[in-house]
C-alpha cells in the first residue's frame, strides 16, 4: 500500500476534502444510475418516458396525450394529424394515370350517350294501293270509293318511337272528297319497321256527278281517275313530336272493285275513316 501511495501527488487538505466529496457523490450517482439501468433492463417499457415537444431549448409536454403517447378514447374523430407536405402519402403514384383514365371513361360514356340518343330520321315509305272498293247510288248519281293503302314506317333510332296519329285526305280536281284520321296507332322498336294498312272513304257527288257517267260507262274497261293523296304521320319520342308529310297522285279505277299487287304502284296512301 505505501508503495502505491508514494506515486500519488500531494494535495492540500482543502483539495482532499473536495475530492472526497466528489468521490462520494460519484459513487452515489453511480449507484443510482445502476439502479435505474437495472430497472430499465427489467421492465423494458419505454412508455414511462413522457411524449414531449422540443421547441429549441425547452420542451413542452404534448397536450393531447398528456405525455402518455395514447389518444383518449372517443377523440379519434376530433383529432387531426399533421404530416409534412413532402410526405409521399400526399403524392400517390399513378395520379395522372387515374385522372386520365377517369377523363377517358367520361368521354367514352358521353360519346356513347350522344351516339345512341342522337335523334335520327323516321322514314315513311308508300308501298301502294292495296285495294279499292266501289259502290254507286244511282238515284243520287253518287260514287262511294273506299281506298285501302299500305304504309311502311321505319325507325332508324336506337330507342322506341310512338306513332301518335296518321291523318290523310283525298282530293279530286282540287276538291277534297275524303278525310281520315287514326289515333294511338302503334309503337316502333329500335331499328325496326312496321307496316300499316288504312282506308280512306271518299264520295264523288254533287257538282262532280258527271263522273258517275264516266265510271259506269260499259264501253270502257278501265275507268281510271287521278286522285291526289295527302298524308301526315306524327311520331313522338322523349316528349318531342315530329311530323312527316307526303303527297302524291294516284290512279284509281272507279269502275269496279280492284285489288292491287303491292310494290307496283309509285303513288301515295291514305287511312282509316274518322270516327
Curated annotation (Swiss-Prot):
Residues 119-275 are lumenal. GO terms for molecular function: ATPase binding. Disulfide bonds join 215-254. GO terms for biological process: dendrite morphogenesis; lysosomal transport; lysosome localization; lysosome organization. The keyword Transmembrane helix applies. The keyword Zinc does not apply. Residues 2-97 are cytoplasmic. It is a single-pass type II membrane protein. It is found in: Late endosome membrane; Lysosome membrane; Cell membrane. Residues 1-24 are annotated as: Disordered. Pfam families: TMEM106 (PF07092), TMEM106_N (PF21002). Keywords: Cell membrane, Disulfide bond, Endosome, Glycoprotein, Lipoprotein, Lysosome, Membrane, Myristate, Signal-anchor, Transmembrane, Transmembrane helix, Transport. The chain crosses the membrane at residues 98-118. Belongs to the TMEM106 family. Can form homomers. Interacts (via N-terminus) with MAP6 (via C-terminus). Interacts (via C-terminus) with the vacuolar-type ATPase subunit ATP6AP1. Interacts (via N-terminus) with AP2M1 and CLTC. Interacts with TMEM106C. This is Transmembrane protein 106B. It comes from Bos taurus. The gene is TMEM106B.
Amino acid at each position: 500500500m505505501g508503495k502505491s501511495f508514494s506515486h500519488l501527488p500531494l494535495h492540500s487538505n482543502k483539495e482532499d476534502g473536495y475530492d472526497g466529496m466528489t468521490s462520494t457523490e460519484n459513487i452515489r450517482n453511480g449507484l443510482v444510475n445502476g439502479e435505474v439501468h437495472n430497472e430499465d433492463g427489467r421492465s423494458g417499457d419505454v412508455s414511462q418516458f413522457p411524449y414531449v415537444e422540443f421547441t429549441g431549448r425547452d420542451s413542452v409536454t404534448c397536450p393531447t396525450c398528456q405525455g402518455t403517447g395514447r389518444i383518449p378514447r372517443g377523440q379519434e374523430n376530433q383529432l387531426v394529424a399533421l404530416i409534412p407536405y413532402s410526405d409521399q402519402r400526399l403524392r400517390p403514384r399513378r395520379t395522372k394515370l387515374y385522372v386520365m383514365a377517369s377523363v377517358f371513361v367520361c368521354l367514352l360514356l358521353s360519346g356513347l350517350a350522344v351516339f345512341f340518343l342522337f335523334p335520327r330520321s323516321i322514314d315513311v315509305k308508300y308501298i301502294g294501293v292495296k285495294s279499292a272498293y266501289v259502290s254507286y247510288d244511282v238515284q243520287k248519281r253518287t260514287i262511294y270509293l273506299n281506298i285501302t293503302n299500305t304504309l311502311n314506317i321505319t325507325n332508324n333510332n336506337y330507342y322506341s318511337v310512338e306513332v301518335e296519329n296518321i291523318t290523310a285526305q283525298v282530293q279530286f280536281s282540287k276538291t277534297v272528297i275524303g278525310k281520315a284520321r287514326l289515333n294511338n296507332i302503334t309503337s316502333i322498336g329500335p331499328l325496326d319497321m312496321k307496316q300499316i294498312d288504312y282506308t280512306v272513304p271518299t264520295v264523288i257527288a254533287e257538282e262532280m256527278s258527271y263522273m258517275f257517267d264516266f265510271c259506269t260507262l260499259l264501253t270502257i274497261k278501265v275507268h281510271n281517275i287521278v286522285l291526289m293523296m295527302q298524308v301526315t304521320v306524327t311520331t313522338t319520342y322523349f316528349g318531342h313530336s315530329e311530323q312527316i308529310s307526303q303527297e302524291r297522285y294516284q290512279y284509281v279505277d272507279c269502275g269496279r272493285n280492284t285489288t292491287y299487287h303491292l310494290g307496283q304502284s309509285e303513288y301515295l296512301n291514305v287511312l282509316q275513316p274518322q270516327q
